[in-house]
A protein has these predicted regions:
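Extended carbohydrate-recognition surfaces in non-catalytic/accessory domains of CAZymes
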Residues: 26-115, 168-176, 584-588, 604-610, ...
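Active-site-adjacent substrate/metal-binding segments within catalytic domains
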Residues: 74-101, 105-114, 118-126, 131-134, ...
Length: 893
């Protein structure tokens, strides 16, 4: 069996200074930690109490919650209920969190922001309901200001109901399954999700940046403010600043608050354009200034890129025709359920990129904000989908009260995510209509929804994932007169007829079957058809619930644990530009148990008799060997479906090997070897050093190996047990076996195809985590993970230093290396100057002098300071020609 560690293909995102220290934090959180000085934004994920059940009076301040379970959020209360007879478990329950008002919050406007609460939540502060949100996938916020206790205890209570009404066709999870934030602002402030950064003119030489900012006045008199926006590049250089004076109308009894919009335009030269291959990010830092005093601030990441949707050319990104090689994906993960840590999402996206995938459809709902951050950084395109079914109640009320709540929910969806360059298209619904023809209510609703979206964001195309119209190509083609792209589920056979009915229509495969039982791949209807801009197969990653009850296996090419299945390489052979060859053992065209399933192909060369062999490849030809015997040569041109079959290959113990040839030269090789009996457990962590931030994750793969360290693929269903101690916790244990309903939140599980998966999360205390793994009759294994202090850098002075002689310097970043415990300090000198750089301890004593009046030429410099055994607030002080200084805080935890 293959045993080399999988190396995921990934791009290097150019976000140098953002590497600093908060491994568990998203890009947005790192930006806010770096820049926000007036606004205070705190993540309040720790210290929640949770209890299932509809408990009367649980919102009351004095309610006794001492017997409730203490947990951190994100949290999914349904994952412990998942079973063979309860594939989509709903739940009802309460969350409560006690807090005192943090320092700096007094006299401010205070809101709580929930990135996601599933489902039908009601929010209470100190016994008073302050908000509610029925559709559980959109983010929302509530004003706490009138109900806060300035001193003493405050109680935030959240009620969730995901049981009363069926609202999902797949596993949704239940509870506060995304982050929660406490935010303090001035009473004249930037509205939450109130910035829209667009790029009306794009070129590498020069680009135009348009920044639209909504300013809220929560006071009863008109307020005049200066809106100052500065554009920074990814290493922290300030590029352009613009100031605009605006007078915001007073709030009234009728309006509650008043909102005015400030539009600013800046021009940047020598631009780095965002694209899938060069995911370069800029950010806009906006300050609200009152009589020369900064009162509020906001930071927005964005990319400079141009999207065009051109008839008979397709999707153009910065003028380059781009096909969406896509997958559909639900929001859950094993074994965490709907509460997915960022590290696990990162691992998934990187594996999808390695398959040649370039696009993710967020079927069928918005996902977490940090997921889009990762796509921005890694260059993954996103088809962002709002909802499933609208008000279709067949099989359940999938979107309760859609007609009443859609304007608020759709606006929240678009406004929150509109600045992500990875998002190239909005979908306003999935399979919202059915039938052989396009029904009138579909076109009527699209005529309302599409302009509504365009009023918020004019820069992206709008589509819907349409399954109706199987005998109505003209009706489908006419949708292009309403929406920008005709999105189609399982309609690739009609693309030509639709195009004939409307030659200006652009088509996107929003959902396609993955394998079609050996028929010509759906990708073939896309790759050479300019009016079809891409497709999205169902699905990229296995998911819980839907489909399993009908007896079919999940259809992802990555399994529950993000391990690759054989047909991962089938997709890779279609999508990737790199040479691919991969061996599978079995019949590639066996009747699949459902439309969406794929035949199981073994990756074991422990067989008997004669076997069918499959090779997936994009090479010209493949030469197959069993040991030293050449079985033969096959040519890809002879297989219209790209499934190269080798029937009746005689099994011999040893090695089966496939060599992919291009232009007569060996381009790729794959082999599988005969393995022995299970002998040991082998631990394969993706990292051994974690940040002690309560968020960082080690993704631990545990293999069942033979005595020679080879994975035993077929015959290893041994029960794997583990222990964990130290400064961390397990988030559960999973395998890829969809028929195994052992609890995910457990300390043991049967292996499947020789593997289990254990995500391990750090806590907030530096130290070590010891993991022991065993299986009856096998040699045990162990692992020690190290958790190190997290480092957060915050600028006290935002402007670079310039002294009277014109010398200029800037201390703009500190980056922690968790392996060496060194903090790399970077600074820049614009003209030759004498530089001093020192580190001041919390006591006020200088503990290190990194540069002492050192004369340095113009340029960028870096040095390192070892933070071993350091905890507290340290100050980096940069002096220029012994006069002025720039200071930066470094918090070591």
């Amino acid at each position: 069996m293959r045993h080399s560690k999988i190396n995921s293909a990934s791009k290097i995102s150019v976000i140098i200074f953002l590497i600093a220290g908060i491994a568990g934090a998203s890009l947005t959180e790192r930006l806010e930690g770096r820049f926000l000085k007036s606004r205070i934004k705190l993540r309040i994920d720790e210290g929640w109490k949770v209890q299932s059940g509809n408990i009367p009076g649980a919102q009351a301040t004095g309610f006794n919650d001492s017997s409730w379970t203490t947990t951190n959020v994100p949290h999914d209360m349904s994952i412990t209920l998942y079973s063979a007879t309860n594939l989509d478990p709903g739940a009802i329950g309460w969350y409560r969190r006690h807090f005192t008002l943090p320092a700096g919050f007094a006299g401010k406007k205070v809101i709580v922001q929930f990135d996601g609460v599933y489902h039908d939540s009601k929010i209470y502060l100190n016994g008073t309901q302050v908000g509610n949100q029925q559709y559980g996938y959109v983010s929302f916020y509530c004003d706490l200001t009138p109900y806060l206790n300035a001193t003493g205890d405050n109680v935030l209570a959240v009620f969730v109901d995901n049981e009363t009404v069926r609202n999902s066709r797949w596993y949704s999870g239940t509870g506060i399954f995304r982050h929660v934030w406490l935010i303090a602002t001035d009473f004249v402030y930037v509205r939450n999700w109130g910035t829209a950064v667009t790029t009306p003119a794009v070129a590498a030489a020069q680009s135009q940046i348009r920044v639209q900012t909504d300013i809220v006045n929560d006071l009863t008199t008109a307020q005049t403010r200066t809106v100052q926006t500065t554009i920074y590049d990814s290493i922290g250089n300030a590029l352009q600043t613009v100031d605009t004076t605006i007078t915001v109308k007073p709030k009234t009894i009728d309006t509650v608050m008043s909102i005015d919009t400030c539009v600013q335009t800046l021009v940047l030269s020598s631009c780095n354009l965002w694209s899938p291959s060069t995911p370069y990010l800029y950010y806009a830092y906006t300050r609200i200034i009152n009589n020369a005093t900064p009162a509020d601030d906001y930071v927005t990441q964005f990319g400079i890129r141009q999207l065009q949707y051109v008839a008979n050319q397709g999707l153009l990104i910065n003028g380059v025709a781009t096909k969406m090689k896509g997958i559909c994906m639900h929001h859950m993960a094993v074994p965490t359920g709907a509460a997915v840590p960022e590290r696990m999402s990162e691992r998934t996206i990187k594996e999808l990129l390695a398959s040649g995938c370039t696009s993710i459809r967020t079927s069928h709902n918005p996902v977490s904000p940090e997921f889009y951050d990762l796509c921005d950084q890694l260059g993954m395109l996103v088809l962002d989908e709002w909802c499933d079914k609208w008000y279709d109640t067949s099989g359940g009320a999938f979107y309760e009260n859609w007609a009443q709540t859609w304007p608020k929910d759709l606006a929240s969806f678009i406004e929150r995510d509109r600045n992500h360059p990875s998002i190239v298209m909005w979908s306003v619904g999935n399979e919202v209509a059915s039938g052989a023809t396009v029904p009138p209510y579909l076109t009527t609703n699209l005529q309302i929804l599409v302009p509504y979206v365009k009023n918020i964001d004019k820069t992206r195309a709008v589509t819907n994932a349409c399954v109706a119209g199987s005998s109505d190509p003209a009706g489908l083609g006419a949708l292009a007169n309403i929406e920008d792209i005709v999105g189609l589920n399982y309609k690739e056979a009609q693309y030509g007829a639709i195009h004939s009915s409307n030659p200006n229509a652009l088509i996107l495969g929003t959902e396609q079957a993955p394998y079609l039982n050996g028929a010509v791949p759906t990708w073939f209807a896309v790759r050479n058809t300019p009016y079809v801009i891409g497709h999205h197969i169902w699905v990229g990653v296995d998911f819980l619930a839907e489909g399993i009850s009908s007896g079919g296996p999940p259809s992802g090419y990555l399994d529950y644990c993000i391990f690759r299945k054989a047909w991962f390489y089938y997709q890779q052979s279609q999508w990737s530009d790199s040479p691919v060859v991969h061996i599978g053992i079995g019949n590639a065209v066996d009747p699949a148990p459902s439309t969406w399933a794929t035949p199981f192909l073994s990756e074991s060369w422990n067989q008997s008799g004669s076997v069918n062999v499959v090779t997936y490849t994009n090479c010209d030809s493949v030469i197959l060997y069993v040991n030293a015997t050449k079985i033969g040569t096959e040519y890809l041109n002879n297989f219209s479906n790209m499934i190269m079959q080798w029937p009746n290959v005689q099994y011999q113990s040893g090695v089966i090997k496939a060599i992919g040839m291009k232009s007569g030269i060996q381009a790729a090789v794959d082999s599988i070897m005969t393995v022995g009996k299970p002998a040991k457990v082998f631990l394969k962590p993706d990292r051994t050093t974690l940040y002690a931030d309560g968020e960082d994750i080690c993704c631990l793969e545990v293999d069942i190996d033979d005595a020679n360290d080879n994975l035993v693929f077929n015959d290893s269903t041994d029960t794997v047990q583990f222990t964990l101690s130290g400064q961390g916790r397990s988030l559960g244990i999973g395998s890829a076996d969809y028929t195994n309903f052992e609890p995910f939140k457990a300390m043991s599980r049967k292996a499947y195809n020789g593997r289990v998966f254990i995500p391990i999360q750090s806590d907030t205390v530096p130290g070590t985590i010891t993991v022991g793994v065993s299986s009856p009759g096998l040699t045990s294994g162990s692992l020690i993970l190290t958790t190190v202090p997290q480092v957060i850098t915050t600028a006290i002075r935002s402007a670079p230093l310039r002294n009277t002689q014109g010398s200029r310097a800037d201390l703009f970043t500190c980056v922690c290396n968790p392996d060496s415990k060194n903090i790399q300090v970077r600074y820049r000198v614009d003209v030759p100057s004498a530089i001093s750089l020192s580190v001041i301890a919390p006591s006020g004593r200088m503990v290190n002098c990194l540069a002492n009046n050192k004369y340095q030429a113009a340029g960028a410099y870096s040095t390192e300071w070892n933070a071993m055994n350091r905890i507290g607030v340290y100050l980096f002080v940069l002096k220029i020609n012994n006069t002025k200084m720039v200071r930066k805080i470094c918090i070591v935890r």
